[in-house]
């Protein structure tokens, strides 16, 4: 069965946060094509402010093939428009970015843009990152000491740190390098999380049925961030993030449209 929907790590995070009641500004590269216009309109219908430089390229697209267990088997991504984003494209939005307390980055951004954001905003802003993939997480290598929050899966953390260690050991290394808070997910083996108060484990109870794994990691991050913004502890935030991830796993879409139901639990 072939299904088309909007996705992308950053976009998924934005939609999740908007559906959880947050006012979000999304600065990204969107093409001036029908897909880009529809994507922008859909987010704006959720009260998201969408800012984008003007591009003639096509909006990014992504094709994923899932196996019988609803796990991703292979994926192909066309992100040329993001890869071509330059620092000068962001300069018109410099003051808008400066007005926010927190900046969330996903590692789909190219190295030049990531380095500029840190050099420009690291002193007075909380910077939070989502690793995205093992081959892109190294883009954050030189900025770990300025990270307020880091989230990845186990494979991505191993690629970042060049260590075949356990999640707990990798968390310890991240904290030693100056990361303030970090979360490493390891599928049904659970979630490791840590901050200045130590490193802890969260047991994940597997769902009996998974509809799609697409977007589950993005929902986990969004749920954790929502709880932290509500001034919950990291332990409470991880538990809430797990609820958000389970919502995504139970949905055929990259973002569960009923994710706000977990606010009632």
Question: What residues fall within each predicted segment?
Answer:
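Glycine-rich phosphate/adenosyl-contacting loop at the front of the ribokinase-like
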Residues: 1-27, 34-45
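Short, conserved phosphate/pyrophosphate- and ester-handling motifs at nucleotide-, phospho-/glycolipid
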Residues: 17, 153, 217
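Hydrophobic residues at beta-strand termini and immediately following loops
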Residues: 27, 76, 202-203
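Short hydrophobic segments within beta-strands
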Residues: 27-29, 66
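Ribokinase/PfkB-type carbohydrate-kinase core domain
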Residues: 42-53, 66-149, 154-199, 262
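C-terminal catalytic lobe of FAD-dependent flavoproteins
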Residues: 63
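Conserved phosphate-binding/catalytic region of the ribokinase-like
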Residues: 167-265
């Amino acid at each position: 069965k072939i299904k088309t929907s909007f996705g992308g790590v950053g976009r998924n995070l934005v939609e999740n946060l908007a559906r959880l009641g947050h006012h979000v500004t999304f600065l990204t590269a969107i093409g001036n094509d029908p897909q880009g216009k529809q994507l922008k309109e859909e987010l704006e219908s959720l009260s998201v402010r969408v800012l984008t430089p003007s591009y003639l390229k096509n909006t990014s697209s992504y094709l994923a093939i899932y196996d019988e267990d609803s796990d991703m088997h292979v994926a192909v991504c066309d992100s040329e428009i993001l890869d071509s984003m330059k620092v000068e494209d962001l300069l018109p939005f410099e003051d808008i970015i400066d007005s926010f307390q927190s900046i969330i980055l996903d590692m789909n951004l190219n190295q030049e843009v990531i380095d500029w954001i840190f050099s420009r905003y690291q002193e007075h802003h909380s910077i939070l990152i989502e690793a995205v993939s093992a081959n892109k997480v190294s883009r954050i290598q030189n900025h770990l000491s300025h990270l307020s929050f880091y989230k990845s899966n186990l494979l991505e953390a191993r690629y970042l740190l060049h260590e075949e260690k356990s999640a707990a050991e990798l968390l310890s290394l991240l904290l030693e390098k100056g990361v303030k808070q970090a979360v490493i997910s390891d599928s049904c083996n659970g979630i490791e999380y840590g901050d200045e108060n130590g490193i802890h484990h969260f047991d994940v109870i597997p769902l009996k049925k998974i509809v799609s794994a697409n977007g589950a990691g993005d929902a986990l991050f969004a749920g954790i961030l929502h709880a932290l913004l509500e001034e919950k502890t990291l332990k409470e935030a991880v538990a809430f993030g797990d609820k958000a991830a389970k919502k995504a796993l139970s949905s055929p879409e990259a973002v569960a449209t009923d994710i706000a139901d977990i606010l009632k639990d």
